[in-house]
Amino acid sequence: MKFSESWLREWVNPAVSREALSHQITMAGLEVDGVDAVAAEFNGVVIGEVVECGLHPDADKLRVTKVSVGSSELIDIVCGAPNCRQGLKVAVAMVGAVLPGDFKIKKAKLRGMPSEGMLCSYSELGIDIDSDGIIELPLDAPLGTDLREYLKLDDAVIEVDLTANRADCLGMVGLAREVGVLNRQAVTEPQWQAVTPTTDAKVTINVKESAACPRYLGRVVKNVNVKAATPLWMQEKLRRSGIRSIDPIVDITNFVLVEFGQPMHAFDLAKLTGDIQVRLGNGEEKITLLDGSEVTIPSDTLVIADDARPLALAGVFGGEYSGVSDTTQDILLECAFFAPLAIMGKSRRLGLHTDSSHRFERGVDPEMQHKVIDRATRLVLDICGGEAGPVVEAKSDADLPKPAQILLRRSKLDKILGHYVPDSDVVEILERLGFSVVKGEGCWQVITATYRFDMAIEEDLIEEVARIYGYNNIPNVAPIASLRMSDHKETDLSLKRVRSLLVARGFQEAVTYSFVDPKLQNLVHPGEQAMVLPNPISSEMSAMRLSMFTGLLTAVGYNQSRQQGRVRLFETGLRFVPDINAESGVRQQAMLGCVITGPQNDEHWAMESKTVDFFDLKGDLEAIIGLTVSASEFSFRVATHSALHPGQCAEILRNDRVIGHIGAIHPSLEKPFGLNGKTIVFELELDALLHTSLPLAQAVSKFPANRRDIAVVVDESVSAGDVMKLIRKVGENQLVGINLFDVYLGKGVEPGKKSLAIALTLQDTTRTLEEKEIAETVESVVSALKTEFNASLRD
């Protein structure tokens, strides 16, 4: 909703600045989106009249004029505007004037002819009006008057973002009421002479859907001059409300729309056949609208029709056939109340959204129609002339909405606000809002206003009291509450620690949708059944995720397409696996997923550029596992997964139970997800990760540690993890450290075999180990490896 400050102040003029007024409106819940000047800064521009206008002797497109600005001397001005002509009232920038952009007007010669000023267009003065040529002012504009003063250009356009419940403020009358209430000032509505019918011309109105249209008014106005000029004051008020001037009849209906928030429509009376009918479409009728588009009218859509055809979509859009044109002489003014539910959604279904439907969907005042049709008729008579007939009304009192009756309790008011507002203030606020208030014992019986469709329950009234009383006048009081420490098992690893570790290792947390593209998910989990949403946001978001892979891979592709070469993401969330044995038929599991791609490190002169591989992400996962005291319970095992590379995939196990997978993305998935380069992922069950054991404090041994390196040759199929696990088991008493520092295949090692170089660190907490003891431990390790894996020491 746009409106000019000056127009608002015609209704109510509080003694506050523009900034304070905007702040008041915002704090009242009508958020001010912007305040813009109606014109750029300029000075020295006055109203003049072109007394003489002739062609320039040396330029076909220039005109030499003599202009009067009310003084005894005429001013010579050379002008290039095509609409410059004798007798025209114009905007004259005098010598010394400063126009927008710090453009100063000086005496000059154009093609040899003197020019002592400039005839201005709207754009040259920073006024947003589409117009060819110079400004054309009304013939009664007073010569010599400052243009800023005449057009009231020291004004601002205020744009308010209204919520759907405040339809009463979709007109100047509602905004003025709000400002008046906030400043304890009375609202001065415009005054006009009531219209007395001067002709008996009228139409018969037949409302067949009274629940959808409880009130319909029609009035004939004969012999109107549709070619009359819309007054400049009306054009300016419409422009500052974001509406361009079209013709006087349309301008008048738009003007009362902005003034009172009540949509109207005008029909060409000569195009009507028989009675006016308000009925539903039959599902087969078509209508060409005022914008030239043709629509088929659904059977549940309300229309205005005559005996021959539909004339308009009720409350939405007028029809082209019956619209006012240059040849119109007699018009029928329509002013109606349409029930919000009768209009709601109809315009959007047809791809339309109009100022009328916007208001009717939210609700207009059902008691406003008589006043508005009289206001519009008076404006038509004053601007276009003509003779007005009587107002014809079709009304269903039973279907007209009634003001809500709401009981407001003092106890409920105090409880919700947490602050005592005196009884006198409560009554004053509600009455200033136009409500009727009757005091009871510890309560008030309130009858709301007809224009407040959003008043239905007690909390609505409490909000109004708080809003007008002022949120800033309600002190901040800390709630009284008993604090209790939350339960936390020491055997549980907190998710916060896991998140912090991943962030410290260069990851960023992603939050993806729980519903994913079923086509992409089928590539990741072929043949697995997923939950399908009955009403998805879109077809690409219609399946619940079976793992974190789909969302994370989509996020990687999104980032890579935006020049992000190095991507490291993690996400925690639920996966949804159909399970007939689970509650509601779905098993929800909390999961942790990570993905990396691109270089290991950000580009740096002292670092070699190297692409991430399987072991980079495995190292990150082992760092997470290291947060638990139960790291020895975790292991990895070569496996296969439909989404992972068959040669670079492993299961993640805890106590020999599979809790997740890690590996490189299968090459067949790179193109569908838009992946560029090797991508490594893992996913595991959070519950299996976060449960740990209490740490046991141990003294640090003061005796020296001893390192022994062994190189064992095993089959290529033997997992290094299994080898390390066996060594740890055999040497658990004295072996304090195991490190695989080399894997070798090639010369000196038989085909099908590999060499594992392992560092063994031995230490005792009570004494220094002797060489014999160390040798025995190493020998027991080698012997166990030989027995289990047919391993041999490499020479």
From Swiss-Prot:
Enzyme Commission designation? 6.1.1.20
Q: Does the keyword Glycoprotein apply?
A: no
- What is its EC class? ligase
The chain positions of domain B5 read 401-476
Q: Which GO terms describe its cellular component?
A: phenylalanine-tRNA ligase complex
Q: Report which reactions are catalysed by this protein.
A: tRNA(Phe) + L-phenylalanine + ATP = L-phenylalanyl-tRNA(Phe) + AMP + diphosphate + H(+)
Q: Where is Mg(2+) annotated to bind? A: 454, 460, 463-464
The record places domain tRNA-binding at 39-148
Localization, UniProt: Cytoplasm
In the record, biological process GO terms are: phenylalanyl-tRNA aminoacylation
Q: Which InterPro entries match?
A: aa-tRNA-synth_II/BPL/LPL, B3/B4_tRNA-bd, DNA-bd_dom_put_sf, Fdx_antiC-bd, Fdx_antiC-bd_sf, NA-bd_OB-fold, Phe-tRNA-ligase_IIc_bsu, Phe-tRNA-ligase_IIc_bsu_bact
Free-text remark on how the cofactor is bound:
Binds 2 magnesium ions per tetramer.
Instruction: Decide whether keyword Amino-acid biosynthesis is in the record.
Output: no
Name the protein family: Belongs to the phenylalanyl-tRNA synthetase beta subunit family. Type 1 subfamily.
Assembly description: Tetramer of two alpha and two beta subunits.
Concerning PANTHER family, the annotation shows: PHENYLALANINE--TRNA LIGASE BETA SUBUNIT (PTHR10947:SF0), PHENYLALANYL-TRNA SYNTHETASE BETA CHAIN AND LEUCINE-RICH REPEAT-CONTAINING PROTEIN 47 (PTHR10947)
- The identity of this protein, by name, is Phenylalanine--tRNA ligase beta subunit
